[in-house]
């Protein structure tokens, strides 16, 4: 959506190495530090250790729940309940305003702990509607969870796929557990691979950004890694993260105890280079813990070992608006702080076309408009204003509309396909312009034109309502 031709300045255009991605994918990935090589210098992430169980035993993994001295996937210092997790997210988001994404990556598999995982995601979506949600999984039960992931607003999913050969899979995995049955050997590999591919295809068909993680294991799966990249790219995955095997005896894994060699830097680089011919590569992965907090390569989890009382936490919406201004400033290199810059909201099913009725929108895409260009800042989720065909009048949903007004208090305009007369008037009373002239058109056409027309008519000191 953002292009150098959108505005004269062009300072916020995507880096050249994002050229393999569509504009929509590049915009969505830009603020996710694990999905964007440039984003990880500017935005922070948080992993929530709420998922202890696993349905797949990998020979390179040994889960630990009370470990503070190992830096690798599958370990955490503690386990959190969903209720504790959302308190911790609020605590961290207040302390680290660069936080853009919260993910569940273990210590086991999130989808093997489906009740805990979805309760956590639902609480975050309800209480912190602007945070990006992601999840990392082995993919075994992914096909069964796609619809629920979409419903709760997860739009980034990482799937660990180490091979597409069932015989090789039998060397990597000791067993899997599915529908009350335990499988091993080639049979387990066939089941796992089929379900992983099905899950990836279903996610990408729904517009979810899928990253593939693969552990490079010399002498086992290294020769077939380019085939993994090729097949998963064809299935719609957009980036491949090839990670070196960690196999040290002190970690207690099968490979570590059996002396399986780790790949050297040259082997890893050569494999990434071959795979990069068919699929963009992630090369900045730090193989984070299941409780990592902060920028990539900067784990601040030990600063947040004590949970505050929920009632002691400040209201979230003022923090949300402050964070939006900061994230816009980061993404535009300060241009969003100019007097003629502003934030706007778009009612859209996926962010690139204005295609939703105001009352039917369950999320708004927030864009920064400035001399730097049009930049996607975040998505904000909300209960729909209209709950049905006959429930779209203010007397029926005053509380819902008030909540939407509070959520959008820092924007100058709302773009949608249609909007009722009463909410139109109420938005105008709050200084928010309802815009329907761009219905069914790309945001990349409508928003820049609107900004160019309006920018000269605003006062020199443009107030940002709702921002403390």
UniProtKB/Swiss-Prot annotation:
* Cross-referenced Pfam families: Nitro_FeMo-Co, Radical_SAM
**Top EC class for this record:** lyase
Q: GO:BP terms for this protein?
A: nitrogen fixation
Binding-site positions, [4Fe-4S] cluster 1: 54, 58, 61
What is the residue range of the signal peptide feature? none
Listed InterPro entries: Aldolase_TIM, Di-Nase_FeMo-co_biosynth, DiNase_FeMo-co_biosyn_sf, Elp3/MiaA/NifB-like_rSAM, MoaA_NifB_PqqE_Fe-S-bd_CS, Nase_CF_NifB, NifB_C, rSAM
Question: What keywords appear on the UniProt entry?
Answer: 4Fe-4S, Iron, Iron-sulfur, Lyase, Metal-binding, Nitrogen fixation, S-adenosyl-L-methionine
| PROSITE patterns xrefs | MOAA_NIFB_PQQE, RADICAL_SAM
Q: Which cofactor does it need?
A: [4Fe-4S] cluster
Cofactor descriptive note: Binds 3 [4Fe-4S] clusters per monomer. One cluster is coordinated with 3 cysteines and an exchangeable S-adenosyl-L-methionine. The two others probably act as substrate.
Annotated pathway: Cofactor biosynthesis; Fe-Mo cofactor biosynthesis
**Residue ranges of domain Radical SAM core in the record:** 40-289
Q: Name one GO molecular function term.
A: lyase activity
Could you say which residues bind S-adenosyl-L-methionine here?
Answer: 60, 108, 160, 212
Under which EC number(s) is this enzyme classified?
4.-.-.-
Q: Which residues bind [4Fe-4S] cluster 2?
A: 285, 288
- Protein family: Belongs to the radical SAM superfamily. NifB family.
Task: Tell me the function of this protein.
Answer: Involved in the biosynthesis of the iron-molybdenum cofactor (FeMo-co or M-cluster) found in the dinitrogenase enzyme of the nitrogenase complex in nitrogen-fixing microorganisms. NifB catalyzes the crucial step of radical SAM-dependent carbide insertion that occurs concomitant with the insertion of a 9th sulfur and the rearrangement/coupling of two [4Fe-4S] clusters into a [8Fe-9S-C] cluster, the precursor to the M-cluster.
**What is this protein's name?**
FeMo cofactor biosynthesis protein NifB
Q: What gene makes this protein?
A: nifB
